[in-house]
Design a protein with these regions (language model features):
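Short S/T/G/P-rich N-terminal loop/turn motif that feeds into the first structured element of a domain
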Residues: 1-53, 60-70, 93-95
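C-terminal structural segments of small proteins and small subunits
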Residues: 62-90
Length: 95
């Protein structure tokens, strides 16, 4: 069953650091069967007060997603992400 990592980007406090993170993260995804479904897509708020930028990653299953997140390659980048942006990430399984 497909699994998704959903990230909400609430703010970027180091644009250069975040740009470096973004330029390097895709390679870490491919090694674990992951891909971007939503990244910087155009949005239209239908209801409520939506502020964060949304990113959605797709993996073949939750094991692949966890292996990506826990991988040395991604964990090496995650510190850069935490230093350069305010984000939340969740893992959710599809139907």
């Amino acid at each position: 069953m497909a699994a998704y990592v959903v990230a909400q980007v609430h703010g970027v406090n180091d644009p250069a650091g975040f740009a470096e993170y973004r330029s390097r993260v895709t390679a870490t995804l491919h090694a674990h069967g992951g891909k971007f479904l939503v990244r910087d897509g155009a949005t239209r708020v239908l209801e409520g007060d939506w502020r964060p930028v949304l990113v959605i990653l797709e993996f073949g299953d939750a094991d692949q997603a966890n292996e990506w997140y826990d991988s040395a390659a991604y964990q090496g980048l995650s510190e850069l992400r935490r230093q350069s942006a305010v984000m939340e990430l969740i893992l959710v399984e599809g139907v």
